Amino acid sequence: MLSPYMSPVERVWFYSLRILCGLILLFLILPVLVIVPLSFNSGSFLVYPLQGFSLHWYQDFFASAEWMRSLKNSIIVAPAATVLAMVFGTLAAIGLTRGDFPGKSLVMALVISPMVVPVVIIGVASYLFFAPLGLGNSFFSLIVVHAVLGVPFVIITVSATLQGFNHNLVRAAASLGASPLTTFRRVTLPLIAPGVISGALFAFATSFDEVVVTLFLAGPEQATLPRQMFSGIRENLSPTIAAAATLLIAFSVILLLTLEWLRGRSEKLRTAQV
């Protein structure tokens, strides 16, 4: 807030900083904003100015067998990879948070390494691993590797939630005769649920938008929506790609709003525990 006691230099800095932040934000979102109007263009090319308003390219998207197959594949792969990432990521986060053993930092670095290793390296390594097994072009390999990419997000969000977890609740449940499984299901899991769901949403978004690994591991029958968009850009540049991109943008916005809601809920739960 602008203070009435600011000097002229402080006022210039105040407004300059906000203008700079606005320009950076515009630079980041402008490519996204550019693609949306093109999806409603009545013309057959991805060019400005727009020739008119039309929903033809959305109709083409939903009427195309190739686009629908790629969408179906994404709906198969992303939820399956998310479930795997959520289960293994949550268990790993609990073990790494509560455990105290030699090499703990090294193990943590290894399990979150897919976040920092270039995806193309993961794609090549995955292909060299699965291809000799005859699983190079299969949903199995695609789901497993997508889950590996999503696990670090779950570990980080769940670990952050566990930092404010009151372990006296677990001890109290155990003292009342609850088994470890019952304690986890009825005490631990409800309290760390915002972190688990947040990580799962990140894992889902990562899998749903991933294209590099998919290029290495997916055949024509396993092509996901991002790969179909990539192929369309190379082979047949059509505004249908803009329609697909707009749908992905809308989906991403919904995910971000959901994550923000979960973050607020997590803060309330943490405050209530204190």
Predicted regions located by residue number:
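Transmembrane-helix boundary motif in ABC transporter permease subunits
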Residues: 2-10, 79-111, 128, 167-170, ...
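C-terminal transmembrane helix and the adjacent membrane-cytosol boundary/short C-terminal tail
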Residues: 2-19, 159-174, 180-189, 242-274
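Membrane-interfacial helix termini and adjacent extracytoplasmic/periplasmic loops
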Residues: 3-7, 46, 50, 55, ...
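Interhelical loop and adjacent transmembrane-helix boundary motif
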Residues: 6-13, 43, 58-66, 208-258, ...
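Transmembrane alpha-helices
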Residues: 19-20, 25-32, 123, 148, ...
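Hydrophobic alpha-helical transmembrane segments of multipass integral membrane proteins
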Residues: 26, 68, 72, 76-88, ...
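Short membrane-interfacial helix/loop motifs at transmembrane-helix boundaries
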Residues: 30-65, 215-220, 274
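Loop-to-helix entry region at the N-terminal start of transmembrane alpha-helices
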Residues: 69-76, 128-153, 157, 193-195, ...
